[in-house]
């Protein structure tokens, strides 16, 4: 029997709830969830951030799955990490050596690095929280 796939992403996961579930204090999760941002709807297998482009933004997956990829010598994309609903990709000071694409139709919250940095600078416990998440992600991926 054939099934129909929705043309829109699955309902988004609350960023606030995901961060609180991961161990972040609710008031800090509220600050991140209320940060100025825009929502992107991303189609599968189409890179929306190419390797080498600036990473002056923070991204949180609201629904779907994102892949961080690197291009091998033959030009094929090799997935090095996945981000699921509620997880994020943090900003960098330099260009990133990886690209980002959706695995399935996804919805992504994108904020400016300076807004994110302002919140993190004012609340040092956020640095410790994100450091723990980065260490956890490195355990599972090739980042």
Describe the function of each predicted region.
Residues 1-143:
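Cytosolic regulatory regions built on CNB/CRP/Popeye-like sensor folds
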């Amino acid at each position: 029997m054939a099934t129909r796939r929705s043309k829109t992403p699955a309902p988004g996961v609350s960023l606030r709830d995901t961060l609180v579930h991961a161990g972040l204090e609710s008031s800090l999760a509220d600050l991140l969830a209320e940060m100025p941002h825009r929502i992107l709807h991303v189609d599968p297998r189409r890179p929306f951030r190419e390797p080498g482009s600036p990473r002056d933004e923070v991204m949180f997956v609201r629904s779907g799955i994102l892949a961080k990829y690197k291009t091998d010598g033959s030009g094929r994309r090799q997935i090095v990490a996945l981000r699921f609903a509620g997880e994020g990709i943090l900003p960098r000071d330099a260009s990133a050596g990886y690209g980002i694409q959706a695995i399935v139709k996804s919805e992504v919250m994108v904020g400016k690095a300076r807004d994110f940095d302002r919140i993190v600078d004012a609340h040092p416990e956020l640095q410790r929280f994100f450091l723990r998440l980065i260490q956890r992600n490195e355990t599972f991926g090739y980042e």
